[in-house]
Amino acid sequence: MIKICTVYFEDDWSSYTPDYVGKLYRSLLKNSTIPFEFICISDTDVEADIVLPYNHYSDIKKHWHKLKYFSPHFANQKPGDEIIIMDIDQVITGNIDDLIGYPVLDNQFISYGTWWPRKIKVNGGFYKFKSGQFDYIWNDFALNPAYWQSHYYENGDVHYRYYGEQNYVNWKLYEKGVKVIETPKEWLGKYTDNKKDMVEMNKMYSKISNTDYMILDDVNEKIKVVHFNGVNNTIHKYKENFIEKYWG
């Protein structure tokens, strides 16, 4: 069984709404022929196959709850299950059978292939692995969540407190000598409201994909997912045609 796992929470820091979960869920269903179970840790009602409680009173903050899915004892995981962890700030723009069905063997870790400059290998928007095979990511974090949740901010690796979850995952994989396998880079698009950045990103994407553009009025046909990562880079603030066409 493929389990696609997400997190949603409401607080003063987050500007997402519950329909982000539902839109991602419906888009995945519409654009895949592969059966999966969609799970969300949430503090409010959301559209999913299974909704698990988000605890605001625990030591675990914000999106760090994603790490719970690395435990084989969480979300009714069974041996052999393929676990996918996704962020909800993504728009599915085409068939994703190749993405969610991306082959994963024992002790392999799959993440988005990215084409822009980054200091780490993993991309927190998409992880795929077999249930329980990286349980130390959760186990080690659970020993001292307060330390890890502040470490990357205090170290200057991220610019906002409680960011750095993907940095932690990247470090634990590096520590254990795990090679991160990237999905094809041309499958992933990126969007921001900074027009200058979008021009440069279109150039970078065109170079790696041997095409003329990433996103203009529509997205390039090679793209399967557009990620709106970044603080306050919410999908619902945009009026672009491709968002109206594909989002939910």
Q: Which stretches of residues belong to each language-model region?
A:
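Non-transmembrane alpha-helical segments in soluble domains
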Residues: 25, 29, 100, 166-174
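N-terminal anchoring/stem segment of glycosyltransferases
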Residues: 1-62, 74-79, 131, 230, ...
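Amphipathic coiled-coil/heptad-repeat helices and related helical stalk/stem segments
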Residues: 21-24, 63-66, 92, 165
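A structural signal for short, well-ordered beta-strand segments and their strand-loop junctions
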Residues: 39-41, 84-87, 92, 109-111, ...
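A generic structural signal for well-ordered coil/turn residues at beta-strand boundaries
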Residues: 122-123, 222
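Residues at alpha-helix caps and immediate loop-helix transition turns in enzyme cores, especially N-
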Residues: 16-20, 95-96, 239
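GT-A fold catalytic core of metal-dependent nucleotide-sugar glycosyltransferases
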Residues: 46, 53, 64-122, 128-132
